[in-house]
Regions:
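Glycine-rich beta-alpha junction loops
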Residues: 1, 81-84, 149, 158
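Conserved N-terminal catalytic core of the sugar/cofactor nucleotidyltransferase
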Residues: 1-45
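Short glycine-rich anion-binding loops that position phosphate/pyrophosphate groups of nucleotides
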Residues: 4-5, 30, 53-56, 83
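Hydrophobic packing residues within well-ordered alpha-helices of enzyme cores
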Residues: 9-13, 66, 116, 163
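Residue-level signal for inorganic ion chemistry
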Residues: 38, 51-52, 81, 112, ...
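Short aromatic/hydrophobic "clamp" motif used to bind/position activated sugar donors
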Residues: 47-49
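Conserved core of the sugar-phosphate nucleotidyltransferase
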Residues: 57-145, 173
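Hydrophobic helical membrane-anchoring modules
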Residues: 151-173
Length: 173
């Protein structure tokens, strides 16, 4: 969280009676730096879930798969198949890509805490796209688990409308 928003966060916690013990890490210049700041506050040898706030529709089944795989294999990254056609665009040219060889990566990306803390001690690399890419640079193999298609990333106004519709549909069941 940006340092300038800490007071607002505390006000929200009071207003909504959010009393679960927690720590808030200061956001960094990039996602890498923000996650690194959060990991510095974390102790122990348990499992850590690193999740995007812009993915509010993660399922309990996805969380369970991530946890169980991270316990057994050290890490777990949810993924869903690509359902649309994909084209590679470069130097003014484009060509189709075999989407059967592609997956979309989601969060929470889940890790044994000491493993991901060690990975985040390496210097920042602009090629890091997510936590899995940070760990992968250490030589670790990334374990993909089944994600859930509803766990969309809310980037555009249309994404927010879609999420609202999914929540309305879920609550009307």
């Amino acid at each position: 969280l940006p340092a300038a928003q800490f007071v607002f966060w505390e006000e929200l916690c009071r207003r909504h009676r959010f009393e679960i013990p927690h720590q808030v890490a200061c956001g960094g210049e990039t996602r890498f730096h923000s996650v690194s700041n959060g990991l510095e506050l974390t102790r122990g040898d348990g499992i850590v879930f690193i999740h995007d706030g812009v993915r509010p529709l993660v399922s309990s089944d996805t969380l369970r798969r991530c946890f169980e795989t991270a316990v057994q294999q050290g890490n777990a990254v949810p993924a869903v198949p690509v359902s649309e056609s994909v084209r590679w665009v470069e130097n003014g040219l484009n060509h189709p890509v075999d989407r059967s060889k592609l997956v979309l990566i989601q969060t929470p990306q889940t890790f044994r805490l000491p493993l991901i803390q060690a990975a985040y001690r390496q210097p920042f690399d602009p090629a890091f796209t997510d936590d899995a890419s940070v760990l992968e640079k250490t030589g670790a193999a990334i374990q993909l688990v089944e994600g859930n298609p509803e766990n969309i990333k809310i980037t555009w106004p249309a994404d927010l409308r879609l999420a609202e519709l999914m929540l309305e549909t879920e609550t009307s069941r």
